[in-house]
């Protein structure tokens, strides 16, 4: 009598993942620009992940129960002071997400110099000021910084000299920070494409996305921030490009 062995053809095996470290808990996350746009989506994502968001913005967030301080992020001293006040209010951060941003469109010679420089102060200097003030707490917690660049961190665009300069600066700052704090603080650069937010409101029509523009849902972008924050200690996502599949500004 002969016996046959069942064929294993077509069967799949389950990988043993028991040795993998568990995702990190999302703790207290300071979010600049958390009152609107991507920042507000990050606040919601942090709450959904069981974390505690705290907002630094020029306006209060619409979501009730979220700690916040109104601050001009273009004022570096005020931004640093706001971080210290948030520590007293909600405790030290385990992560910082710098989602605040502004813009001034137009030819360089036609933009008011103060408006041009404000873009750099908010987007770059505001990012640096908040991160600098939070670093001692982040290092103690082995926390994470997520800065927000742009596809204009990767290439310049006509009539966007201020925004391009500020976002190239954020990218360079983030790369250098990652090298400086390697092994002590996680550092991630998020490069989002265009999103369906109020960021484009107030622009003249020539500087608004066209009717056929493929803009991403900010909630999708915010979800990737949570992925970065949940990386186990010793693992980091150094750079993320997140955009709608029809994004035209990159590559």
Kindly give the residue locations of the regions a language model identified.
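Active-site helix of classical SDR
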Residues: 131, 166
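Residue(s) in the substrate-gating loop at a strand-loop-helix junction
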Residues: 150
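Substrate-binding pocket helix/loop in short-chain dehydrogenase/reductase
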Residues: 107-108, 115-117
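Conserved NAD(P)H cofactor-binding loop of Rossmann-fold oxidoreductase domains
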Residues: 99-104
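C-terminal helical subdomain
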Residues: 189-190, 209-250
